[in-house]
Amino acid sequence: MLESMYYEFFFIFPKERELFESFLLDATDLALEESSLEDLKAFDDKETIGFISQSSWRYFATHGPLKEDLKEKLPHLDHFVILRSEKDLNSSLIPALESFCLSLQENLQNEFDFFYLSRNLASKDWLEAYKQAILPVQCGKFYIHPSWHQKPSHIATDFSIMIDPALAFGSGHHESTSMCLELLSNLDLKHKNALDVGCGSGILSIALKKQGVSTLVACDTDSLAIEETLKNFSLNQISLSTQDEIICGSTQKIQGHFDIIVANIVADVIKSLYSEFVRLCNHTLILSGILETHLNSVLQIYYNGFEILEQQQRNEWVALKLLKKQSIN
């Protein structure tokens, strides 16, 4: 019997990483993992470190030679994206990514490039290695753990969240999600009504419910995210009240006002939602998923309607806790 295989792709996007990651999500409906050599060293993943350090990366550019193997020059490995699939996507995804790169060049009048590697692994070997590498993480008062790690007895159930990272859109391991959870940890949300925009895996919605919000509305334009949110609600034994809603769609489907809004999404979407957040927010707005290079453009838009209460930064990612100015309606 042939052994089932798993395919692993590594990407480096020197420019506009958010746009490339959004394209990968739309093109594959697969979860992405952002990583670095330091992350792999922390997990003692010597095999993967050897593979990405010693392999000849493929390179595509809209300028110079369009495609080549890098034999001696290695790309900067501080940040790369990992995508895993049960199918070999080399013949479909890579050409699509090249076309996307060329379309960005045409639309943005700039040069773009990316690096990539791929390999195939036995499914059982990859799954076992993956489980050994994913460890629980503390985010503020929340203890985030995968289903194969039991919660320690000293951790309160109220602050324990079970998420399987590779099967979800947010797990607490990414800087943007962990900062959101830390900012939420310091808030008294009992009897407040809350909105989670771009709910993904539902991790922030679960945190809001565990903090005692009276009403929760969560939305995402991706139907797969809605499925993940509902699955993780069940996994964490979170019950929805008659006032709670999980909506497949944008904020335009939502009415009312909310004491707390959280949005862990890309900066371009955050900027486009300013008027919606002014309409929906009564008090506190937490924004995350903002790359440092996009922070000033976000602040320029939000300055008129919100004041900054707290700003956090971890590596290149920034999270903001904002207060709505009462003069803005």
UniProtKB/Swiss-Prot annotation:
GO terms for cellular component: cytoplasm. Transmembrane segments: none annotated. One of its GO terms (molecular function) is protein-lysine N-methyltransferase activity. Keywords: Cytoplasm, Methyltransferase, S-adenosyl-L-methionine, Transferase. The keyword Methyltransferase applies. S-adenosyl-L-methionine binds at T177, G198, D220, N264. It catalyses: L-lysyl-[protein] + 3 S-adenosyl-L-methionine = N(6),N(6),N(6)-trimethyl-L-lysyl-[protein] + 3 S-adenosyl-L-homocysteine + 3 H(+). InterPro entries: Ribosomal_L11_MeTrfase_PrmA (IPR050078), Ribosomal_PrmA_MeTrfase (IPR004498), SAM-dependent_MTases_sf (IPR029063). It is found in: Cytoplasm. GO terms for biological process: methylation. Methylates ribosomal protein L11. This is Ribosomal protein L11 methyltransferase. It comes from Helicobacter acinonychis (strain Sheeba).
